[in-house]
Amino acid sequence: MWFPQIIAGMAAGGAASAMTPGKVLFTNALGLGCSRSRGLFLEMFGTAVLCLTVLMTAVEKRETNFMAALPIGISLFMAHMALTGYTGTGVNPARSLGAAVAARYFPHYHWIYWISPLLGAFLAWSVWQLLQILDYTTYVNAEKAAGQKKED
């Protein structure tokens, strides 16, 4: 799945570059005052929140959630709002690579945009597994049942 996504990221970067005049401005770069370690952790936590949202809304199949795209989109929007000024918001290695290829600009810290999403995905999966072990659905279902009893 990685290879097609990377090709698509480069194609999207090239298409966006072709459609916008002048220099490519959508590359990922650390903002002023943002160190590599800060950028690494910000990207990791932004990706973790996004991945945990996907796991809890789209992957968790205990009940159907036809509105899963809404919280996922809101999570991505919030990651962009929080991170763009600091890191340019990668949260996806293919997106970061596509923009870098289109701009022909690979900063010495480009590795952050590859390592952070992997660490963030692992962190989200770990939290999700912990919630599975703690059987969080027992509490969620008890709250839903209590809410239904109040309505009756």
Curated annotation (Swiss-Prot):
Position of sequence motif NPA: 92-94
InterPro entries assigned: Aquaporin-like, Aquaporin_transptr, MIP
Q: Which GO terms describe its cellular component?
A: plasma membrane
Q: Matching Pfam families, A to Z? A: MIP (PF00230)
Q: Where in the cell is it found?
A: Membrane
Q: Cytoplasmic topology: which positions?
A: 1-5, 60-65, 132-152
Query: Which keywords are on file for this protein?
Result: Membrane, Transmembrane, Transmembrane helix
The keyword Protein transport belongs to this UniProt entry's keyword annotation: no
How does this protein sit in the membrane?
A: Multi-pass membrane protein
Q: Which domain of life is it from?
A: Eukaryota
PANTHER family per UniProt: AQUAPORIN TRANSPORTER, MIP17260P
Instruction: Please report the name of this protein according to its UniProt entry.
Output: Putative uncharacterized protein YLL053C
Organism annotation: Saccharomyces cerevisiae (strain ATCC 204508 / S288c)
